[in-house]
């Protein structure tokens, strides 16, 4: 990101202890862990405001695990890593539910679970293999060799520990409960590692911070070149209908290997997202926040095909920018040559599943050293 000479006219200098960059779910969680677990004096800053990025634009799915079926995660990462990351998602859910329980305002959550659905016979075979692997690890699921919704799907896995949440309000309550000072609308444009501190240049303030934690996900490559090739901004698109007189899907629904997703909202509407698989050239590797007419035409067709009973008109459409990791796992570490700058980024569309536990490990690694386990960027040095 850049800031003009004129925009720095009111810039001040300030010395602080622990700076979190990014006021989404990961940033709010990092602020909580840094302040409440490690006793740091925390300031959070963001180019916009709390929850205005992907944290407040996603579908609100708390779905366990990674963005690939469990048996494929075992094949790709090894059994130990797949099991560890699954556990991280459950730990994140525990943190989110605790924040919701202690929230000073209502944060809606629906604990009815999720349903992973197969759109083809081939995907049904994949779901069966995933179900076997999950059951072998004694993970609580139920497998259906048919479509439990009677909507033209081929098979399903029900994950009862999953949930749907209002993600924007969750981001707001996490930040509120962190106790950190917030400086919004404040773009970061330069980082310098000095002796014993980091000089952080932002539009409003030049911070002299003892520690910096980047929770900037999709926008990380714009902050430091280290992230180029490691985190790719990727656009997602959603729509929501006018209120309905029925509930089409009593779960968070997830199909076509996660490319399509749908749920009922807390105000009785139907939310549908996806369409990126059919438009990857335009939707991948972009941070441009805009609607893609091709994607939304596909979503409209999909709605009619699988949910013909949803006849209410579309009320709203939007997009959000996800941060896709180069290997599908979140990234935790410190910047090369900047040992006091840590990061927790690259959630690959699964920030609600992984952001809290990842931020927890990232803060501990920055302050105490040691390994962040499966999400530590040291894995790239070993490969």
Ranges and model annotations:
Residues 304-383:
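C-terminal catalytic lobe of FAD-dependent flavoproteins
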Residues 57-88:
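Glycine-rich active-site loop/strand segments that organize a redox cofactor
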Residues 191-270:
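Flavin-dependent oxidoreductases
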Residues 247-336:
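Active-site lid/adjacent beta-loop-alpha segment flanking the redox-cofactor pocket in flavoenzymes
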Residues 1-18, 36-37:
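Extreme N-terminal leader/targeting segments of oxidoreductases
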Residues 36-57:
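Glycine-rich FAD pyrophosphate-binding loop
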Residues 68-74, 98-173, 195:
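Flavin (FAD/FMN) cofactor-binding and adjacent substrate-gating region
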Residues 156-211:
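Helical element adjacent to the flavin cofactor pocket in flavoenzyme catalytic cores
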């Amino acid at each position: 990101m850049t800031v003009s000479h004129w925009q720095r006219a009111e810039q001040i200098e300030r010395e602080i202890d622990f700076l979190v960059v990014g006021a989404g779910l990961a940033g709010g969680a990092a602020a909580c862990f840094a302040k409440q677990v490690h006793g740091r004096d925390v300031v959070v800053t963001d180019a916009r405001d709390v929850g205005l990025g992907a944290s407040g634009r996603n579908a609100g799915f708390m779905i366990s695990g990674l963005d690939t079926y469990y048996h494929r995660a075992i094949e790709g990462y090894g059994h130990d890593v797949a099991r560890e990351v699954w556990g991280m998602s459950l730990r994140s859910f525990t943190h989110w539910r605790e924040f919701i329980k202690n929230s000073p305002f209502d944060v809606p959550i629906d604990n009815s679970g999720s349903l992973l659905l197969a759109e083809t016979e081939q995907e049904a075979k994949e779901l069966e293999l995933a179900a076997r692997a999950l059951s072998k690890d004694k993970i609580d699921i139920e497998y259906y060799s048919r479509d439990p919704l009677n909507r033209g799907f081929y098979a399903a896995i029900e994950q009862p520990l999953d949930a749907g949440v209002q993600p924007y309000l969750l981001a707001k309550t996490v930040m509120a409960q962190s106790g950190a000072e917030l400086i919004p609308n404040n773009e970061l444009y330069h980082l310098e590692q000095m002796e014993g501190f980091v000089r952080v240049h932002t539009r409003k303030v030049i911070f002299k911070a003892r520690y910096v934690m980047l929770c900037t996900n999709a926008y990380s490559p714009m902050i430091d070149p280290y992230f180029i090739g490691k985190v790719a901004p990727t656009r997602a698109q959603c729509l929501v209908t006018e209120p309905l007189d029925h509930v089409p899907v009593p779960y968070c629904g997830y199909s076509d290997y996660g490319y399509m997703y749908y749920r009922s909202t807390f105000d009785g509407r139907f939310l549908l997202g996806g369409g990126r698989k059919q438009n990857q050239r335009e939707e991948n590797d972009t941070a441009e926040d805009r609607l893609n007419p091709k994607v939304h035409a596909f979503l409209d067709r999909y709605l009619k095909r699988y949910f013909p009973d949803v006849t209410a008109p579309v009320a709203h459409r939007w997009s959000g920018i996800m941060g896709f990791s180069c290997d599908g796992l979140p990234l935790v570490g410190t910047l090369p040559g900047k040992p006091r700058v840590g990061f927790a980024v690259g959630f690959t569309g699964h920030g609600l599943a992984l952001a809290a536990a990842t931020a927890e490990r990232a803060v501990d690694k920055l302050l105490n050293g040691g390994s962040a386990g499966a999400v530590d960027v040291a894995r790239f040095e070993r490969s």
